[in-house]
Amino acid sequence: MKFLLVFDFDHTIIDENSDTWIVKCTPERKLPNGLRNSYQPGHWTEYMGRVFVYLGDNGVKEDEMKRTMTTIPFTAGMIDLLGFIGENKELFDCIIVSDSNTVFIDWILKAADFHKVFDEVFTNPAAFSSTGYLTVQHFHAHHCAKCPKNLCKRKVLKEFLDKQLERGVSYTQIVYIGDGGNDLCPVMFLKKNDIAMPRQGYTLEKKISQLAQSLSPVQCSVLVWSSAIDIMSYLKLLLKE
């Protein structure tokens, strides 16, 4: 018996958006209007690339960024939940699928000593250039019309499950924990014995609810959470079964 836990990162594991939090490093703690207004829907990663250039141009160094990022608060109950998962790793495989980037997620998980809880992190690759600028790239290319062009979480999940099957690993149940609009595509891929756990009051919960109202509900079970303690209670029930 093994369960797969799939986590989003921003507004799920942490209680903020890591990409907008980095703006605290700018000289005025805000971006100039021209840069802020340059975002085009579906092209967030390119926008963040421009933000990182602006930070570099203003002399913001790696250590300052790291200090700022590691002050992001975890979502209520999340520290307890990740501790619980860490104590039961023989039953839980755990992955992150996120539109953030490798540098931010790595900093935050390592600072809190949670990096060993997660088996894999799927997110946009980022690195510091020789001149000290943070650069970010698209995670992959895909053909899904519903998702931003740099990341389709359904594709990531499907490829991960296929790879695990090749290794002889299959899961009793998939538990998908997220909050955003880009979490709907993978949730619609889940089967009836899986469970989606959307965060209360966020886009994913609203979109799942709209599907149910239009009589095309998702196949999986749905359990809304407001604190990660709700998620932990559910996982404890799973282990009792």
Annotate each PLM feature.
Residues 76-84, 88-95, 100-241:
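C-terminal cap/substrate-recognition subdomain and adjoining C-terminal extension
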Residues 1-125, 130:
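Alpha-helical substrate-recognition element adjacent to the catalytic core
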